[in-house]
Amino acid sequence: MPDYRSKTSTHGRNMAGARALWRATGMKDEDFKKPIIAIANSFTQFVPGHVHLKDMGQLVAREVERAGGVAKEFNTIAVDDGIAMGHDGMLYSLPSREIIADSVEYMVNAHCADAIVCISNCDKITPGMLMASLRLNIPVIFVSGGPMEAGKTKLASHGLDLVDAMVIAADSTASDEKVAEYERSACPTCGSCSGMFTANSMNCLTEALGLALPGNGSALATHSDREQLFLQAGRTIVDLCRQYYKENDDSVLPRNIANFKAFENAMTLDIAMGGSTNTILHLLAAAQEAEIDFDLRHIDRLSRKVPQLCKVAPNIQKYHMEDVHRAGGIFSILGELARGGLLHTDLPTVHSKTLAEGIAKWDITQTDDEAVHTFFKAGPAGIPTQTAFSQSTRWDSLDDDRENGCIRSVEHAYSQEGGLAVLYGNIALDGCVVKTAGVDESIHVFEGNAKIFESQDSAVRGILADEVKAGDIVIIRYEGPKGGPGMQEMLYPTSYLKSKGLGKDCALLTDGRFSGGTSGLSIGHASPEAAAGGAIGLVRDGDKVLIDIPNRSINLLIDDAEMAERRTEQDKKGWKPVESRPRKVTTALKAYALLATSADKGAVRDKALLDKLVP
């Protein structure tokens, strides 16, 4: 049986000094025989998805200690992508993922913790903690802060979210009063933004990976039911420690739970629910930490056979995460996928011996358990608040309509191909990604004229100045992991295209990425990126580009000889923006750019380069 990792710092005469320090934190003699559980919290007052997490660590800690463990809490950083967006702050968002992963590794390894409870929520925090967990490979469970309630206003017949506020603000016909009303109403409570944006997508995927409890991705931050997830996480992590350290059962380790098949399950769910394209980036990064051969080829294969079973904002205005929960949450989507033969259900999870057992217990269409049905009736109260567990509103009924409801069966899918696709072609030899769930079917094949911008800032100025016309394909380059650096999100350009009435008349291609709030024909992650010699850097104003989603292709319509001639010319000039960019690139960002890979590798550090630099 493996020894507790913490024994390194708690046993032996030579550790008297370390024990003295442990005692100064409150530990007693009997505690040195127990597992030390690291609680990786991410509370901050900067981020609405994390503003309510201040007391969550101690809530979990008390339950850990009741169950026989020793809990020690620390915090990671957390960047709010929405607040950081539209200015140089967005350069720091993706690099913060690596900082979060490293900080968890540093704290856990420096103090020899035996297991981790990851309290995450928003865009880069869940992926960063996931990367660290798979890197460390010790018992772990994820419990997130939960989704925000959708906003309500008399000026709109549908629920509001952050994107609605951005779009209306860019609409020159909207009055200041209307903009102010949307702004005040769009984000009414604590929690991660209310649609199927990156944060909620990733929290849902932790359920499919087997590393979180059912309801983790969908139970509202404000609802009293969510408290039980935190309490259960505290009990579960101690049990996972017992199984591994006392019973020598390594099936509970994250690399054995989140194995290749589990990554396929997570991606299958992502495609079926039309999740954010950022999830592809983060799953690729996490797979590398787990040393799993999972790449865009696998995602491309899955995208061709998995139907879209769920549509949520920003892909449709009718539904938000509160509606997904009412329809049975993630385990009901998994149940439909399993019935369609699209899941590996023989895999372990942190809460069930197999995923099949979990689905049987938690899919509302399979179980008669009234407690499960009551749990999924938890709904929004419509009261602005920053307080967790502050309301206990319930719907009168569940949404179990699998023909026309929020969650559909395979037979009644929104579409027989899923909500994400990988495109290849001479403009993106290593691939690029598009959220097809947000693309009108009429423009799944689109040929247009390239309109080149060498930064997001210049693209925004150009769109607002009406330089972009119907039929254009906006190309924003040198915004990849190296070129940005930091691979900015392009929510403002896509939102402004919509506000200009060009949402169905234009496309956008970038080596940057998109917010989970993006919809429209928005293609990101073009790899290799321009700064790494990618062909997106060879496109010129007015070039014809053909996008063909059904055939999974994207091509610059010039011949090979012309492409080769342009490449030779660009090699002489150097792969950098033509226009100067008033952008301060700090030492921290330069360090990230030096080691960053393109998006097809998850924008992680180049480990081969690192091994050369530090053998």
UniProtKB/Swiss-Prot annotation:
Binds 1 [2Fe-2S] cluster per subunit. This cluster acts as a Lewis acid cofactor. The modification N6-carboxylysine is found at residue 124. Its cofactor is [2Fe-2S] cluster; Mg(2+). InterPro entries: Dihydro-acid_dehy_C (IPR042096), DihydroxyA_deHydtase (IPR004404), DiOHA_6PGluconate_deHydtase_CS (IPR020558), ILV_EDD_C (IPR056740), ILV_EDD_N (IPR000581), IlvD/EDD_N (IPR037237). Mg(2+) binds at residues 81, 123-124, 489. Pfam families: ILV_EDD_C, ILVD_EDD_N. It catalyses: (2R)-2,3-dihydroxy-3-methylbutanoate = 3-methyl-2-oxobutanoate + H2O; (2R,3R)-2,3-dihydroxy-3-methylpentanoate = (S)-3-methyl-2-oxopentanoate + H2O. The active site is at residue 515. Its EC number is 4.2.1.9. SUPFAM superfamilies: IlvD/EDD N-terminal domain-like, LeuD/IlvD-like. GO terms for cellular component: cytosol. One of its GO terms (biological process) is isoleucine biosynthetic process. [2Fe-2S] cluster binds at residues 122, 193. Disulfide bonds: none annotated. Pathway: Amino-acid biosynthesis; L-isoleucine biosynthesis; L-isoleucine from 2-oxobutanoate: step 3/4; Amino-acid biosynthesis; L-valine biosynthesis; L-valine from pyruvate: step 3/4. Keywords: 2Fe-2S, Amino-acid biosynthesis, Branched-chain amino acid biosynthesis, Iron, Iron-sulfur, Lyase, Magnesium, Metal-binding. GO terms for molecular function: 2 iron, 2 sulfur cluster binding; dihydroxy-acid dehydratase activity; magnesium ion binding. Homodimer. Belongs to the IlvD/Edd family. Functions in the biosynthesis of branched-chain amino acids. Catalyzes the dehydration of (2R,3R)-2,3-dihydroxy-3-methylpentanoate (2,3-dihydroxy-3-methylvalerate) into 2-oxo-3-methylpentanoate (2-oxo-3-methylvalerate) and of (2R)-2,3-dihydroxy-3-methylbutanoate (2,3-dihydroxyisovalerate) into 2-oxo-3-methylbutanoate (2-oxoisovalerate), the penultimate precursor to L-isoleucine and L-valine, respectively. This is Dihydroxy-acid dehydratase. It comes from Pseudomonas savastanoi pv. phaseolicola (strain 1448A / Race 6). The lineage of its organism: Bacteria, Pseudomonadati, Pseudomonadota, Gammaproteobacteria, Pseudomonadales.
